[in-house]
From Swiss-Prot:
Protein name according to UniProt: Ankyrin repeat and SOCS box protein 7
Keyword Repeat: yes
Pathway: Protein modification; protein ubiquitination
Residue ranges the record marks as coiled coil: none
Gene expressing this chain: ASB7
Provenance organism: Pongo abelii (Sumatran orangutan)
PROSITE patterns (alphabetical): ANK_REP_REGION, ANK_REPEAT, SOCS
Top-level taxonomic group: Eukaryota
Database matches in SUPFAM superfamilies: Ankyrin repeat (SSF48403), SOCS box-like (SSF158235)
Xref: PANTHER family: ANKYRIN REPEAT AND SOCS BOX CONTAINING 7 (PTHR24173:SF88), ANKYRIN REPEAT CONTAINING (PTHR24173)
Gene Ontology biological process: intracellular signal transduction; protein ubiquitination
Amino acid sequence: MLHHHCRRNPELQEESQIQAAVAAGDVHTVRKMLEQGYSPNGRDANGWTLLHFSAARGKERCVRVFLEHGADPTVKDLIGGFTALHYAAMHGRARIARLMLESEYRSDIINAKSNDGWTPLHVAAHYGRDSFVRLLLEFKAEVDPLSDKGTTPLQLAIIRERSSCVKILLDHNANIDIQNGFLLRYAVIKSNHSYCRMFLQRGADTNLGRLEDGQTPLHLSALRDDVLCARMLYNYGADTNTRNYEGQTPLAVSISISGSSRPCLDFLQEVTRQPRNLQDLCRIKIRQCIGLQNLKLLDELPIAKVMKDYLKHKSDDI
């Protein structure tokens, strides 16, 4: 036992010495110890390598030296199965990430999953690291990877209200209708009108219902008595006759809350009674034909500006 302690003690001292050098950004000492044979892939009690440590601390020059001396960025720690790239994402260390992504290990780390199925893109979206999100997508990270709970980076960005990340992910064709329309329903439930408008403008399907009860975004607007959301949804094509699993239309849901006059109830009664005009039906159909991926290219269509504005709902009073 004494022999084991004596043998281990110098190793622990070396580990502490090189970690202290990394923390201080002392590249000279780091390089010297590596050249003397210190392995960059040794792991501490948490399973961290020196690459984990330097990536989390933001020590770019140390990361470069470790990679030059054979550091392996695919190693996962014992805390959550995170790679050094996950920690770089957590702290927004985009320049450090670029060093790792330009290495031979890129394909092994860019979509690497933690114990919970989180990729670096999940982490970056969760923490709102928009420049990091851009970098990962530049290096062709999978835009809609599913965690073990079936969550995508876009969903995390929405839940955490990381607006910049949301826009970047949508610009890179993240699935706006993931989990049968989760994003639009979430925006309605949270009464987040700016998100609701953004998703609708980008072509979110207004009529997808929750798998557990069939409630569409318009049903949820009725439940929340949110007339602004209801107007937006209707203008973008929500079907007032869609029924949930209990056989209720949005109007029936609104009446079930209270039969007395309320803005949302009054609106739903009005639009349920009257059919859409031909002009609005044409707009809905044209937007559907253009398709999700091409809606952002409306400005490039060889049509009059007034028609482009109409297709973008710019004249809507909502």
